[in-house]
Design a protein with these regions (language model features):
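Non-catalytic protein-protein interaction segments used by genome-maintenance enzymes to assemble
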Residues: 104-160, 197
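Short acidic (Asp/Glu) and glycine-rich catalytic loops that position anionic groups and cofactors
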Residues: 17-22, 41-42, 64, 136-140, ...
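A non-catalytic, helix-rich entry segment at domain boundaries
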Residues: 42-108, 112
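Short, polar/flexible loop-turn hinges at active-site or ligand-entry regions and domain interfaces
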Residues: 25-33, 51-53, 145-146, 213
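Hydrophobic (often cysteine-bearing) scaffold residues that line and stabilize catalytic clefts
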Residues: 32, 36, 80, 152-155, ...
Length: 236
């Protein structure tokens, strides 16, 4: 089967939620946070690919790639749009001061893992002045992760493994660029855990194929389906 980071993460959080989304075809409706985040990602990709590094070009990209769905009304959409303009204006100033060179933007990868295929999409890989590579993931939440949270997060390690196995790029640094918070958190990448991560990705894919979808109620309080799931463990 084909497994992405999203499928892997959701299955490891709660196999029953995985079943809801990827077997039963349930959908999570867009909301203002998800629409804002995707709009900012799309604008950054368009701008970085354009070759025009001006602020006007970045704001033009935001207008062109803005997603209008998910907002309760036009007033709310206008507030979120103004926030996106502020966020990207600040990002532009920070980006212009960096000396790194992007070598990959929204780069898709696939690589074989036994009988499975691992697929993913990397926001950005930069080559730094010393020749090393930095893998960057954009986040649009209000708070940047702490260094400890970054160390515990499997997403960037999943992407770093994909960069090496599929693209032949061995990254030295993992970075979360919290665009909304205006902060970057980085750590050196240690590839020593790649074998264990690959084994767990493969094990998750095996379990999915075998139809093992038992619920894990630890994540119920923040689940999108907590109000209509028979297994939800939510205090009244």
């Amino acid at each position: 089967m084909e497994i992405s980071y999203t499928r892997y993460r959701i299955y490891r959080e709660c196999p029953w939620k995985y079943k809801f989304l990827f077997v039963d075809g349930r959908r999570i409706p867009p909301n203002e946070k998800s629409s804002f985040g995707l709009s900012v990602h799309r604008a950054l990709e368009t701008w970085l690919r354009s070759g025009d590094d001006s602020l006007d070009a970045l704001l033009d990209a935001l207008r062109a790639r803005w997603l209008a769905g998910g907002y309760p009304d036009e007033s709310a959409e206008s507030r979120w749009y103004a926030k996106a303009e502020r966020v990207l204006t600040r990002f532009h100033g920070e980006e212009m001061s960096r000396r790194a060179r992007p070598i990959a933007l929204e780069k898709e990868f696939t690589w074989p893992l036994g009988r499975h295929t691992v697929r993913g999409m990397i926001d950005r890989i930069d080559q730094l002045p010393d020749g090393s590579y930095e893998l960057i993931d954009y986040k649009t939440g209000p708070v940047a992760p702490t260094p400890d949270q970054l160390k515990a997060d499997l997403q960037l390690r999943f992407y770093a493994l994909g960069a090496f196995r599929a693209l032949g790029v061995r990254v030295a640094t993992l970075t979360v660029d919290s665009v909304t918070a205006g902060a970057r958190v980085s750590m050196p990448y240690d590839p020593s855990g790649e074998e264990a991560l690959g084994a767990d990705i493969s094990a998750a894919a095996d379990e999915i194929e075998s139809g093992r979808f038992g619920p894990d109620t630890r994540y119920c309080p923040r689940c999108d389906f907590k109000n209509d799931c028979v297994h939800a463990m939510i205090a009244p």
